[in-house]
């Protein structure tokens, strides 16, 4: 149970692929102009990570060590192709928005890295959980960045959600404030870099505060009964 919890915590927070490892920054920065695009690419990446980790872990005993990387890439490419066809068939608007970044998941360092570092050494169930956790962590980072850029740039949230979820999702669109002149800095690549930098700083501050609280709690437990540690 502790190993399962550790895999989840590592994927979502401690070893977040976007905010800690800084992997897959090209699609992270390019696609997150809206919350819908960010969520779409994040879900696709999560699905690819989960399925490839599961497949590679299942086949790990029959994979020759000398040619394991080409085999991993072939498995990843097959899964990405299937996901790309699904998006093309059921979410064509999103498929057009994401464009080349869907097939580029094949070369994403996150996917290959988890295959080599985790799936090739662990069992199928734990590997699938690792892929899902890493993908969910990346999706959360993409979604937060995409939401911030969309709100600041256009004053909306979930604009174009129907491209991802169907026509019913038009009701999800929220206009935070009205603007006739979008704030282009937030929508263009410089805004993505600035937003990511602020998110990295925010995570660092949260980690430092949590570390300080744990140190204070440990110090209090170490004190003899009846002492508070106050002067």
Curated annotation (Swiss-Prot):
<keyword id="KW-0997">Cell inner membrane</keyword>
<feature type="transmembrane region" description="Helical">
    <location>
        <begin position="18"/>
        <end position="38"/>
    </location>
</feature>
<keyword id="KW-0472">Membrane</keyword>
<keyword id="KW-1003">Cell membrane</keyword>
<protein>
    <recommendedName>
        <fullName>Ion-translocating oxidoreductase complex subunit E</fullName>
        <ecNumber>7.-.-.-</ecNumber>
    </recommendedName>
</protein>
<dbReference type="Pfam" id="PF02508">
    <property type="entry name" value="Rnf-Nqr"/>
</dbReference>
<keyword id="KW-0813">Transport</keyword>
<feature type="transmembrane region" description="Helical">
    <location>
        <begin position="125"/>
        <end position="145"/>
    </location>
</feature>
<keyword id="KW-1133">Transmembrane helix</keyword>
<dbReference type="InterPro" id="IPR003667">
    <property type="entry name" value="NqrDE/RnfAE"/>
</dbReference>
<comment type="subunit">
    <text>The complex is composed of six subunits: RsxA, RsxB, RsxC, RsxD, RsxE and RsxG.</text>
</comment>
<keyword id="KW-0812">Transmembrane</keyword>
<feature type="transmembrane region" description="Helical">
    <location>
        <begin position="86"/>
        <end position="106"/>
    </location>
</feature>
<feature type="transmembrane region" description="Helical">
    <location>
        <begin position="63"/>
        <end position="83"/>
    </location>
</feature>
<feature type="transmembrane region" description="Helical">
    <location>
        <begin position="182"/>
        <end position="202"/>
    </location>
</feature>
<feature type="transmembrane region" description="Helical">
    <location>
        <begin position="39"/>
        <end position="59"/>
    </location>
</feature>
<dbReference type="GO" id="GO:0005886">
    <property type="term" value="C:plasma membrane"/>
</dbReference>
<keyword id="KW-0249">Electron transport</keyword>
<comment type="function">
    <text>Part of a membrane-bound complex that couples electron transfer with translocation of ions across the membrane. Required to maintain the reduced state of SoxR.</text>
</comment>
<dbReference type="InterPro" id="IPR010968">
    <property type="entry name" value="RnfE"/>
</dbReference>
<keyword id="KW-1278">Translocase</keyword>
<comment type="similarity">
    <text>Belongs to the NqrDE/RnfAE family.</text>
</comment>
<dbReference type="GO" id="GO:0022900">
    <property type="term" value="P:electron transport chain"/>
</dbReference>
